[in-house]
Amino acid sequence: MTRTHAAALYNPMGTTALVTGASSGLGVGFAHELARRGADLVLTARRLDRLEALAVDLAEKYGTVSTVIPLDLAEPGAVPELVRNLDERDIRVATLVNNAGFGLFGSLVDAPSNRVHDQVAVNVAALTDLTHALLPGLQSAALAHPHGAALVNLASTAAFQPVPRLAVYAAAKAYVLSFTEALWYETRATGLKVTALCPGPTETEFYAVARRSPGGPRRLMSVDEVMQTAFAALDAPRTPPHVVAGTQNRITAWLAGSAPRRAVVRVTGRLSRR
């Protein structure tokens, strides 16, 4: 990142940010940039060892105070447990990054029912429930700390079109995009910065979890490149309701929204066979 704390319009210094899915990939990227900008962190994900290692790294590099809360957001009651944990520790969250999520590649008819359920539970239900629970506090933080409170929900370029063999994942991300854009409008008078981040193929563990190689000639974006897009949106005087990382991805998203739906799904269906 090239911007300084003083120049950044999004300045979370002295506040607390919660990052879900913080044990790898974009979650780690968000944690580092938020810590660099002076926020303390609440880190949650399933893998305690990774969270603890990240907390140590953030403390050594930035002097960050991190609270580690290991949770599986696919489990019933995970979000209420997380909120209760925050309340018991008297932690007031000013920035929420709903980064946790995953997809599985394959036809729906062949997918294990528990994994279909878990995709919806993490990508949709947990994101919605956590946002709903913390939104009043985020809005209060935005009033108390102008330019220092934000809601970032992880969508995807998959949100802009149906994707055969990633049907549940793409549909979930379409929900996240629509949900976030509506909240952007609902909260516009509070000063809360709200955006849906839509990355394309990125150098994370997504493809390993999805049991699928990226395929095709496209270059994977780095986590740092995606973070530059995310924080440029937060630094903007008027944070956009969504932001797509990468020029090629922006063109693809625009084309998907402009072409007939039947043609789009035929193209994505053919591409998903690669």
Language-model segment annotations:
Residues 131, 172:
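Active-site helix of classical SDR
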Residues 37-54:
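Conserved glycine-rich Rossmann-like NAD(P)H-binding loop of the short-chain dehydrogenase/reductase
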Residues 99-104:
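Conserved NAD(P)H cofactor-binding loop of Rossmann-fold oxidoreductase domains
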Residues 156:
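Residue(s) in the substrate-gating loop at a strand-loop-helix junction
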Residues 107-120:
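Substrate-binding pocket helix/loop in short-chain dehydrogenase/reductase
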